[in-house]
């Protein structure tokens, strides 16, 4: 099976609308490196095709990495600005040495994978499944980002997330002793959606589990809420740590999508954080 056929199979299996029709010339889902007109010897799914992931894919005999995020550290994966960059040169050399093709799968997997007669967001369904929270989803069940869980404290929830997701640690903003039943996994907290997230939290969420967190917007709001006795907390997990389970979940449906028995495995890009505590 050619790599191009793997890619076409996955795209055909998924939905085709992510805030509008997914168009081949504008989608994030592009081949970021390598040829597609060669036989696929194996597939590795991951969130970020880091240098270590590339090495592990090669060691497993895989020549196709399907990643969720960009390869070269910027939106759109532009490389014109990287002329002379030593890290870019070294990563490019590693890719060439290992004979790896990298395809980004972002828009299609978010737009939906078939499950129980409907399309569900493959990334956030993967997170819900990893956490064992499928039965706790409220709101939009096709994009599980709102949950009502058995009551716990924010600190206990943070410890659960660290263990279940295999993290090095995490951070809590607000009241670590706050009682938590309702949890929101918001979209990016990088300015654009911060006010909307603050409004949603005020309307009935005890705790945020965030991909990013902006210190001067949502973090300040949660801290003030806690200091004013409103029992709010935010657990800062990290973008890749939140979305990576969806790429592991992909292994469940990938064989159906490509209709062939190609060796496939998941390699975690892993928690990027190392924590130094007082």
Feature roles, as predicted:
Residues 1-278:
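Active-site catalytic microenvironments in core metabolic enzymes, especially phosphate/sugar-handling
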């Amino acid at each position: 099976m050619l790599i191009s056929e793997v890619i076409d199979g996955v795209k055909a299996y998924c939905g085709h609308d992510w805030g509008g029709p997914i168009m081949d010339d504008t989608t994030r889902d592009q081949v970021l490196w390598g040829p597609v007109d060669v036989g696929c010897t194996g597939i590795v799914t991951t969130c970020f095709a880091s240098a270590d992931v590339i090495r592990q894919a090669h060691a497993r005999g895989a020549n196709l990495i399907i990643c969720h995020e960009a390869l070269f550290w910027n939106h759109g994966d532009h490389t014109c600005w990287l002329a002379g960059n030593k890290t870019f040169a070294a990563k490019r050399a590693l890719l060439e040495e290992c004979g790896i093709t990298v395809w980004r799968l972002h828009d299609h997997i978010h737009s939906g994978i078939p499950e129980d007669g409907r399309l569900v967001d493959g990334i956030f369904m993967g997170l819900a499944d990893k956490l064992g929270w499928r039965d706790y989803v409220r709101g939009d069940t096709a994009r599980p980002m709102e949950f009502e869980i058995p009551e716990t404290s924010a600190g206990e929830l943070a410890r659960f997330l660290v263990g279940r997701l295999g993290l090095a640690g995490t951070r809590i903003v607000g009241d670590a002793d706050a009682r938590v039943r309702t949890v929101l996994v918001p979209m990016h907290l990088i300015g654009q959606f911060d006010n909307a997230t603050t409004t949603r939290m005020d309307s009935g969420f005890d705790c945020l589990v965030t991909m990013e967190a902006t210190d001067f917007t949502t973090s300040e709001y949660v801290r003030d809420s806690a200091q004013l006795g409103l029992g709010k907390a935010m657990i800062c997990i990290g973008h890749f740590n939140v979305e990576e389970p969806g790429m592991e979940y992909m292994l469940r449906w990938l064989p159906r999508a490509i209709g062939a028995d190609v060796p496939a495995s998941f390699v975690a890009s892993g928690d990027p954080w190392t924590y130094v505590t007082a």
